[in-house]
């Protein structure tokens, strides 16, 4: 269970870093938003799911 928690926290940190770097790049590029809108929304949805997963797994660990 601890390994699943650690992997989910690592995934959350990695996705957060990618979104922090990637979203401004997409928004700054010409015609970037219309071509990468689905990727940004997918990343944000994955981030929200990981936040809830980390919260649930944390309740089992603590």
Curated annotation (Swiss-Prot):
Q: Which SUPFAM superfamilies match?
A: PsbZ-like
- The residues that cross the membrane are 8-28, 41-61
Compartments, as annotated in UniProt: Plastid, Chloroplast thylakoid membrane
One Pfam family it belongs to: Ycf9
Sorted alphabetically, which keywords does the UniProt record give? Chloroplast, Membrane, Photosynthesis, Photosystem II, Plastid, Reaction center, Thylakoid, Transmembrane, Transmembrane helix
Q: Name one GO cellular component term.
A: photosystem II reaction center
Q: What is its main location?
A: plastid
Q: Per UniProt, what is the membrane topology? A: Multi-pass membrane protein
Which GO BP terms sit in this record?
Answer: photosynthesis; photosystem II stabilization
According to the record's subunit comment, the protein's assembly and interactions are: PSII is composed of 1 copy each of membrane proteins PsbA, PsbB, PsbC, PsbD, PsbE, PsbF, PsbH, PsbI, PsbJ, PsbK, PsbL, PsbM, PsbT, PsbY, PsbZ, Psb30/Ycf12, at least 3 peripheral proteins of the oxygen-evolving complex and a large number of cofactors. It forms dimeric complexes.
Q: Which NCBIfam families match?
A: PS_II_psbZ
Name the family the entry cites.
Belongs to the PsbZ family.
Q: What is the annotated role of this protein in its UniProt record?
A: May control the interaction of photosystem II (PSII) cores with the light-harvesting antenna, regulates electron flow through the 2 photosystem reaction centers. PSII is a light-driven water plastoquinone oxidoreductase, using light energy to abstract electrons from H(2)O, generating a proton gradient subsequently used for ATP formation.
PANTHER family, per the entry: PHOTOSYSTEM II REACTION CENTER PROTEIN Z
Protein name (record): Photosystem II reaction center protein Z
UniProt organism field: Chaetosphaeridium globosum (Charophycean green alga)
């Amino acid at each position: 269970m601890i390994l699943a928690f650690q992997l989910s926290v690592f995934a959350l940190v990695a996705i957060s870093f990618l979104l922090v770097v990637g979203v401004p790049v997409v928004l700054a590029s010409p015609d970037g938003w219309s071509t990468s809108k689905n990727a940004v929304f997918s990343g944000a949805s994955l981030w929200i799911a990981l936040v809830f997963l980390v919260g649930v797994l944390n309740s089992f660990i603590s």
